[in-house]
């Protein structure tokens, strides 16, 4: 599995702001979008392009454009919605595929409850977004669903990843690519990433 910890100074700065105990909902939400945007820029650097001729202001001109059916962005409900707009800033024509997975707080196991994928999801690059890769259970369940639907090319974007989640994801789906803004120390006894960001979903939506 390709693992990329994107160490751009802007990303480091923004993740640092998100770690603050007193970060506001407004700021956390904006920062999640901004970091998602920066991760998207990195994750799409290898997209294949093709040369086409268009009518320019002064006659025909050759340009490059992304080749093929392009992209579907896959936010994992609900926290993944906080990163979705960051992807769409760069790829506004992307189809949106939504997967609902929540984590049972007692067993820490993923529980699927919703799936609505693009009709041609198997022909698209799937960019899966979720702020936290903790145990990896929710992400693995989501990738299982995508592959069952015919998805062949998948990139995962997360704000913060735990080593335990990375290891589990690599064991289950070694053929995908992972892009993260930070790889943190470990999971605590409750399955939260340390130092982490806290509950990203609650911070994005302003709930507790």
Curated annotation (Swiss-Prot):
Keywords in alphabetical order: Allosteric enzyme, Glycosyltransferase, GTP-binding, Magnesium, Nucleotide-binding, Transferase
Binding locations of 5-phospho-alpha-D-ribose 1-diphosphate: 78, 103, 130-138, 199
UniProt keyword Nucleotide-binding, yes or no: yes
Enzyme nomenclature, EC number: 2.4.2.9
InterPro entries associated with the record: PRibTrfase_dom (IPR000836), PRTase-like (IPR029057), Upp_B (IPR034332), UPRTase/APRTase (IPR050054), Ura_phspho_trans (IPR005765)
Pathway membership, UniProt: Pyrimidine metabolism; UMP biosynthesis via salvage pathway; UMP from uracil: step 1/1
Sites where the protein binds uracil: 193, 198-200
Gene Ontology biological-process entries: UMP salvage; uracil salvage
Primary enzyme class: transferase
Catalyses which reaction(s): UMP + diphosphate = 5-phospho-alpha-D-ribose 1-diphosphate + uracil
GO molecular function: GTP binding; magnesium ion binding; uracil phosphoribosyltransferase activity
Cofactor note: Binds 1 Mg(2+) ion per subunit. The magnesium is bound as Mg-PRPP.
Regulation: Allosterically activated by GTP.
Cofactors demanded by this protein: Mg(2+)
Residues in the signal sequence: none
Free-text function comment from the UniProt entry: Catalyzes the conversion of uracil and 5-phospho-alpha-D-ribose 1-diphosphate (PRPP) to UMP and diphosphate.
Family of this protein: Belongs to the UPRTase family.
Protein's UniProt name: Uracil phosphoribosyltransferase
């Amino acid at each position: 599995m390709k693992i990329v910890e994107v160490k751009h100074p802007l990303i480091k700065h923004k993740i640092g702001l998100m770690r603050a105990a007193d970060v506001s909902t407004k700021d956390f939400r904006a920062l999640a979008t901004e970091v998602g945007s920066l991760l998207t820029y990195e994750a799409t650097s290898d997209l294949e392009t093709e040369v086409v001729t268009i009518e320019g202001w002064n006659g025909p001109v050759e340009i490059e454009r992304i080749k093929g059916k392009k992209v579907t962005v896959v936010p994992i409900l609900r926290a993944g919605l906080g990163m979705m707009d960051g992807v769409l800033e760069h790829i506004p024509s992307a189809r949106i595929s939504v997967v609902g997975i929540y984590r049972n707080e007692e067993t820490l196991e993923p529980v699927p409850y919703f799936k609505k994928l693009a009709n041609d999801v198997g022909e698209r690059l799937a960019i899966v977004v979720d702020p936290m890769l903790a145990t990896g259970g929710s992400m693995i369940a989501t990738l299982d669903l995508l592959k069952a639907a015919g998805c062949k090319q998948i990139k995962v974007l997360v704000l913060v990843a735990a080593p335990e989640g990375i290891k589990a994801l690599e064991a289950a789906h070694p053929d995908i690519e992972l892009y993260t803004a930070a790889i943190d120390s470990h999971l605590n006894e409750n399955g939260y990433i340390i130092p982490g960001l806290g509950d990203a979903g609650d911070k994005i939506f302003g709930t507790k």
